[in-house]
Amino acid sequence: MRALGLVGLVGVANAVCPYMTGELGRRDTNPDATEATEEFLSEYYLDDTDSYLTTDVGGPIEDQQSLKAGARGSTLLEDFIFRQKIQRFDHERVPERAVHARGAGAHGVFTSYGDFSNITAASFLSAEGKETPVFVRFSTVAGSRGSSDLARDVHGFATRFYTDEGNFDIVGNNIPVFFIQDAIQFPDLIHAVKPKGDREIPQAATAHDAAWDFFSQQPSTLHTLLWAMAGHGIPRSFRHVDGFGVHTFRLVTEDGSTKLVKFHWKTLQGLASMVWEEAQQISGKNPDYMRQDLFESIEAGRYPEWELNVQIMDEEDQLRFGFDLFDPTKIVPEEYVPLTPLGKMTLNRNPRNYFAETEQVMFQPGHVVRGVDFTEDPLLQQGRLFSYLDTQLNRNGGPNFEQLPINQPRVAIHNNNRDGAGQMFIPLNPDAYSPNTLKGSTLKQANQTAGRGFFTAPDRTANGNLVRAKSSTFDDAWSQPRLFWNSLLPAEKQFVVNAIRFENANVKSDVVKNNVIVQLNRISNDLATRVAKAIGVDAPEPDNTYYHDNTTSNIGAFGHRLQSLAGLKIAVLASVDAEESFSAATALKAELSNDNLDVIVVAERFSNGVNQTYSASDAIQFDAVVVAPGAEKLFGAKSAANSSSTLYPAGRPLEILVDAFRFGKPVAALGSGSTAFDNAGINTAVEGVYVADAVDESFANNLEEGLTVFKFLDRFALDSDE
C-alpha cells in the first residue's frame, strides 16, 4: 500500500508533560490496583461460612419444609418463609442484554507506560507505572445469554477503567469496524440477524435469509462481514483476540489542543482462531468453551495480557486518507498511521459472583474522563451514547444502576441526582439544586480550569443545514472490503469463501443469493465467482469500479506466531496396558515444565497418571496431539469401525488424531506410536508432524515450535484456481 507522509505523528506521544496547569493537580496516590479492587468489592461480600440460614431481614430460619396444618395437611398462607423463598426465586432473572447477552468477565490492572500529557489530560495516562483497576467483559453479539461461545460472530471487548477521576469505558469489539454507519439503522441490523419472529430460530447465527438480505441491501455491512467470515469470527479463546474501539475519538490536552485517535488492544498471547468445523464441534460438545478457558487460565495464574495502542492523527486528517475518519466502517491502515503503545492490561482476578459482576456491569461509551472527547461519528453520537444508557432502565427497573458495586467509580460521587427505584445512598444535602447559596449545600462547578472537570474540545464546532442524509464521504462501501480481501493469505481467503458458501447454502431466496453475489462482485470477482459456483448462481462478469491491488498488514487471523504458549493443551494419547505410554508422558511434562502448558494424558479408563478418558475426549479440546508408544494398538485399521472396548466409541483414538491433523494442529508420535500415522493416512514429511524415538529436548522444541505456528495452513484444500 502506498505510504503517506506522516512526519510529526510518529512518536508524538512521549513522556514529556508540557501542560501542568490548573488549580487542582492530578491525584498522586497510586495504590496497588489489584488490592484496591479486592478492598472495594469486599465491602459488599456476603460470606456464609459457619453461619445459620436467615431471612433477607436477618432472622434465623429453616426452609426445607413448608408450614402445614398437620403433617399431611394444607400449606398455610402465613408461611412468610415459603413466600420469601419462592418470590425471590421467581424474580431472580432480569432482562438480558438486547445484544452481547452472552459474555464472560474478569478484573485486572492497567499500567501506563509513561506520561502522555502531551496528547491527553487523562489522569490514568499521566505517569509511567501508574496503575488503574479495570474490568473487561468479552461477549458474542447476536446470541441470547444461553447460546454458544462458538457462534460465528463479532465478539465484544468492553473495558472499564476505574480511574482516579471517574470511570472510563472503551466499549469495543474484536473487529475494528462495524456493520452500519448511522445508529438509526441499528434496530434493523439486529432484527435482521436475530432469530425469526415466528419460530425463534436460528439462534446465534446469520445463516438465514433475513441476515443476508440485510447484508446485500446495506453494503456498509460488507467490511465487518468479511472480518467475521474470516477467523476473527471464531477465535481460539477470548485470550487470543485483539480489541478495537471502532470509532475515532478525540484526546484533549490541558490547554485544549486535540488529536484524533483510534484505540487498539493487542493481545500479548498472540492472535489465534479456529476453523469452522472445529468451532461447530466444540459448540456441540462444550458451548462454554471460551468462558471456561478464560476462567481457568486466570485461576491457574496464567494471566492474559493486552497492550493498549492508539493511532494518533491530526484534526486536518479527517479526509486525508481517501475516506472519512468518522466512518465506523473504515480502518486506518497501519502503514498510514502506526500504532503508539500507551500501556499494558493484565487480567488477574475472576469474578466472585457472575450475576453481581459480569451480568450487572453496564458499559457506556459516554463514560469518558477529562482528556477524552467524542467525534462526529453518527454511530457514536446520540446513537450508542444514548442507547447504552437507555437500555439499563429496562434491565434494572430504574435509574440507579450506576450504584451497583461493579458499576460504582472508585472515587467519591457528588451530584444533585436523587431518589428513584433502588436508591442505595443517603444524600446529606437537603437542597439538591444548582446554583445554590445555602450553607453546606453548594456543589462547585468543575470545568477546564477549576476542579479538573471534564471539558469538550474547545475548537469543536457544529454548523450546516438540517438534513436527513448521508455524507458523500461515507459512500464507498467496497474499497476497504477489497483491501481486506487482498491482504489475506490464500488459506484465509478459502476460509472466507467457505464461510459465505455455508451461510448462503442455508438461504432459501434466490433473489437474496443473487443480491449477495452482486455485492461480493463489487469487492472481488474471484470471491463472487467462487461463492456463486457453490450456491447455484451464475458467475458474474467483473464489476471493477472499486477494484485495486492495495494490501495492508495485521489484517488476518492466521499466519501470526503465538507470543505465549501458556494454557495451551497437549493430549498424550496413551493406553493403560502400556507402561511406556506413561513414561513418555512423564518425560514430556518434564521437558515442557517451563512453558505453562497443560499436558493431558488420555487413556481408555482412569488409573494412576490418566487425566482424561477417550470417551470424554475429542481433538477439539487440544492444541496438539502426541501418540505415545504402546498406544498404537488402539489405532488399528479395524478400530475405525469397531471396538473391542466398551469404554469409548469405536474409532475414537484414531478420530482424535485424524481430526487434529485436519484442523491444522501439530501432531506427533513417539517410538512405536508412529505406526498410528499410517492408519490415519498422515504423511510424516509434512510441516507440523513430528516423530521421534523418545522424548528429548529436540522433540519438545519441535512441538513448541508447532504450537507457536498454531495452524498449519497448507493442510487445507484450496479451490483449484488458487
From Swiss-Prot:
It is found in: Secreted. Induction: By hydrogen peroxide, heat shock, paraquat, or uric acid catabolism but not by osmotic stress. Its cofactor is heme. The active site is at H100, N173. Pfam families: Catalase, Catalase-rel, Catalase_C. CDD domains: GATase1_catalase. Keywords: Heme, Hydrogen peroxide, Iron, Metal-binding, Oxidoreductase, Peroxidase, Secreted, Signal. Residues 1-15 form the signal peptide. GO terms for molecular function: catalase activity; heme binding; metal ion binding. Its EC number is 1.11.1.6. It comes from the Eukaryota. It catalyses: 2 H2O2 = O2 + 2 H2O. Heme binds at Y388. GO terms for cellular component: cytosol; extracellular region. InterPro entries: Catalase, Catalase_AS, Catalase_clade2, Catalase_clade2_helical, Catalase_core, Catalase_haem_BS, Catalase_immune_responsive, Catalase_large_C. GO terms for biological process: hydrogen peroxide catabolic process; response to oxidative stress. Belongs to the catalase family. Occurs in almost all aerobically respiring organisms and serves to protect cells from the toxic effects of hydrogen peroxide. This is Catalase B. The gene is catB.
